[in-house]
Amino acid sequence: MKTLCYIVLFFGATTSLAQQTLEQVLLKYNKQSIPYISAEMLAEIQNDPTIILLDSREKKEYEVSHIKGALYAGYEDFDLQEVSKNIKSKDAQIIVYCSLGVRSEDIAETLQKAGYTNIKNLYGGIFNWK
């Protein structure tokens, strides 16, 4: 019985250490180079026809589910020229998302380097979207 208690305590402790909060993950993997937009704020402005919503996940992820109105941008196969065809103005309001907000920051940085000026990263990505 004593051994069983130690095993349970050991696995319980290692599991809790392995779990990180979303904030910890984003602080660890992101540079915070792109401002975030909350899921709540996006929900308020989502129907604005001037907003461009880009899904930076892989094609299979996009095909399974995506936020209504989002355009597929991809990550590994991201093509700036292809995406630029759908964004006429460098000042357009662009919101990029992925699963959590890590890949989307990379894509947003690429867009920023290409001269786009009004980009936000969906905090928590599609997993935080309700």
Q: Each PLM stretch: what is its role?
A:
Residues 1-5:
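Positively charged n-region of N-terminal signal peptides that target proteins for export
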Residues 6-52, 59-63:
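Flexible, polar/low-complexity N-terminal or interdomain linker segments that lie immediately upstream
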Residues 38, 74, 123:
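Short loop/edge segments at beta-strand edges and connector loops
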Residues 45-53, 68-69, 92-94, 117-118:
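Short active-site oxyanion
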Residues 52-81:
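A glycine-rich, hydrophobic loop/mini-helix early in the fold
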Residues 78-130:
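Catalytic cysteine-centered active loop of the rhodanese-like fold, especially the PTP/DSP P-loop
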